[in-house]
Amino acid sequence: MAKPMTITKPVATPLPWRAYLEMTKPRVVALMLLTVLVGMCLAVPGAVPVQPLIAGLVGIGMMAGAAAAYNHLIDRRIDGLMARTYNRPLPKGRISITKALTFATAMAILGFALLYWAVNPLTAWLTFASLIGYAVIYTAYLKRATPQNIVVGGLAGAMPPLLGWTAITGEFHGHALLLVIIIFAWTPPHFWALAIHRRAEYAKVDVPMLPVTHGVEFTKTCIMLYTVLLALACLYPVLVGMCGPLYLVGSTLLSCGFIYKAWQLKYRDKPGLAMQVFRFSIYHLMLLFLLLLVDHYLWS
């Protein structure tokens, strides 16, 4: 008697390029490139030159993606133990360590070369310093060494507006440093909100995030204080004449919203609120820099 025919569905296998793309943290890099673009646009009163604009965004984006890939490499052990990151390419074995290292290094070299030859050496070296700051100083050392890891290491993540500025002008300017200060003040409350939500996971892998070492309530207080500092930092562009009334009104509303969310977290906490604060902080930074961009062209 003939055997009944069975039909089996093919098992979908992830495409290799998706694993490489995931290692570059594309959503994080996209937000970072927005701040680069704003730095570029604010550096000049009129239209931004096309060559440094495109080459700068591509080169900085490549080196940022390389830094993210190095982060995946260095954190692969603890990533495999945390619910948020266990499905990343390296813990799951979708990419070998050798291939990941080759990919990250190739991206870094190509990005640096593009910035050096098509933009300017200053931007290339500053971007390289940011890569070292994030991938080596923060990820390999500070993250595991001190609960102030994100405060000290946050400087590397705050550099993109300065990189955009130097890509267009080839020089430092105080206005660009004000944008760096804004992101520097934004970084701790952004990451500490996530750390509260993932406190048990960080404790499990012995990463001394502030909620692990000093407790959740202390961290909530620090988040509130930093949102106030951030609100003050957001006023700097107005005080020095960089921005006009549109940015002033918009940034004030965003600052009040962030302070209110931090107040809720401290005094009216409920399940899931820490992640709400984390997500709000992302929209806060994105909208703030869009305000800077729109106000620049309206005000100038």
Curated annotation (Swiss-Prot):
Name of the featured protein: Protoheme IX farnesyltransferase 1
Organism taxonomic ancestry: Bacteria, Pseudomonadati, Pseudomonadota, Gammaproteobacteria, Alteromonadales
Classification via PROSITE patterns: UBIA
Membrane disposition: Multi-pass membrane protein
InterPro entries registered for this protein in UniProt: Protohaem_IX_farnesylTrfase (IPR006369), UbiA_prenyltransferase (IPR000537), UbiA_prenylTrfase_CS (IPR030470), UbiA_sf (IPR044878)
Disulfide bonds: none
Catalytic reaction list: heme b + (2E,6E)-farnesyl diphosphate + H2O = Fe(II)-heme o + diphosphate
E.C. number: 2.5.1.141
Entry's Gene Ontology BP terms: heme O biosynthetic process
Misc: Carbon 2 of the heme B porphyrin ring is defined according to the Fischer nomenclature.
Enzyme kind, highest EC tier: transferase
Gene3D superfamilies assigned: UbiA prenyltransferase
Keyword Transmembrane helix: yes
Transmembrane segments annotated in the record for this chain: 28-48, 50-70, 106-126, 150-170, 176-196, 222-242, 243-263, 280-300
GO cellular component: plasma membrane
Keyword vocabulary terms for this entry: Cell inner membrane, Cell membrane, Heme biosynthesis, Membrane, Transferase, Transmembrane, Transmembrane helix
